[in-house]
């Protein structure tokens, strides 16, 4: 369904000054929460995964970045979320890092953002002079998208070009372990004629929700790194005493390197590394509640229950399986 951009524009224009100030305050807080460029890149990867993309491409061309995915196209509701802000978010709340809020982290590296999906094209740019320029959509002609392109994001980088390039070439192939649909991630630098390709392949093993997953990294078609993991996917029933939302189950993925299991652990909130060093021991990913800037796990009943449940699984069932 196409988005009604004109209606969205009218609604934003009708916002009173007090609400405008609240929205701007929330946007400033989000800019602080998502202050690191690598988080913005991870948000774009996660958003692509959430819409079922198998292939994601980051293309640097001069001072512009394009991000292309082949998942589901934007719905009208998606456009509305992009053009709105939940002003109830505050520093002490459990931040909703879902599509719409996390996406606004892109304004940390670009003040000129365009989105093309389906028959719609919109642009947000600071030079418009609007107080709510980060959520006010300007209609632009949609691109003639190729068959393998569902959604294209375009960003003008300003002085952040080098920082973005450094983050992109430093993406670890291990993040693919925790994505549901993305199988390949390409970073293409047109100016320097360099291409980085991260790929994931998997095959089922004996046992429920267990796969042997291979992730590899190639630079200009030459493989530079390849690793194998046994990945266990486990759904845990959430006791009412720690339940945060309406969900009665939560999913956790445990990745064990085939090269061997040791006692060190890295904890991820989805694809964000929160604790632990890269490539040490096993890795686990789940809906952990983190500090605002992802640098630690909050000390609360939810995290205690989830960690105890996962580590209990690792110490019993998982270790027994890896000995077989």
What spans do the regions from the language model cover?
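GHKL (Bergerat-fold) ATPase N-terminal catalytic module, capturing the glycine-rich phosphate-binding loop
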Residues: 1-148, 152-162
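GHKL/Bergerat-fold ATPase module
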Residues: 1, 110, 115-324
């Amino acid at each position: 369904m196409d988005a009604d951009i004109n209606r969205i524009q009218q609604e934003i224009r009708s916002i009173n000054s007090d609400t405008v100030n609240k929205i701007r305050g929330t946007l400033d807080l989000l800019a602080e929460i998502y202050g690191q460029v690598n988080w913005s890149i991870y948000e774009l990867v996660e958003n692509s995964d959430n819409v079922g993309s198998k292939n994601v491409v980051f293309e640097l061309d001069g001072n512009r970045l394009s991000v292309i995915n082949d998942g589901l196209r934007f719905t009208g509701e998606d456009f509305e979320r992009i053009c709105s802000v939940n002003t109830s978010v505050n520093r002490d709340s459990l931040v909703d890092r879902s599509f719409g809020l996390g996406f606004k982290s892109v304004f940390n590296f670009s003040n000129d953002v365009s989105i093309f999906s389906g028959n719609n094209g919109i642009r947000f740019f600071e030079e418009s002079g609007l107080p709510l320029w980060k959520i006010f959509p300007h209609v632009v002609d949609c691109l003639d998208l190729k068959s393998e392109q569902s959604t294209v994001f375009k960003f003008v980088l300003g002085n952040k070009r080098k920082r973005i390039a450094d983050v992109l070439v430093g993406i670890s192939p291990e993040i693919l372990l925790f994505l549901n649909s993305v199988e390949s991630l390409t970073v293409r630098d047109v100016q320097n004629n360099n291409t980085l390709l991260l790929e994931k392949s998997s095959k089922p093993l004996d046992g429920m929700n267990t796969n042997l997953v291979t992730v590899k990294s190639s630079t200009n078609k030459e493989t530079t790194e390849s690793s194998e993991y046994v990945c266990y996917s486990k759904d845990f029933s959430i006791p009412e005493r720690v339940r945060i939302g309406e969900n009665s189950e939560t999913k956790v993925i445990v990745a064990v390197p085939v090269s061997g299991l040791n006692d060190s652990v890295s904890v991820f909130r989805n694809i964000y590394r929160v604790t632990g060093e890269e490539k040490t021991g096993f890795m686990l990913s789940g809906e952990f509640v983190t500090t605002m800037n992802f640098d630690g796990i909050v000390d609360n009943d939810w995290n205690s229950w989830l960690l105890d449940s996962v580590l209990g699984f690792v110490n019993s069932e998982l270790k027994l399986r890896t000995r077989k």
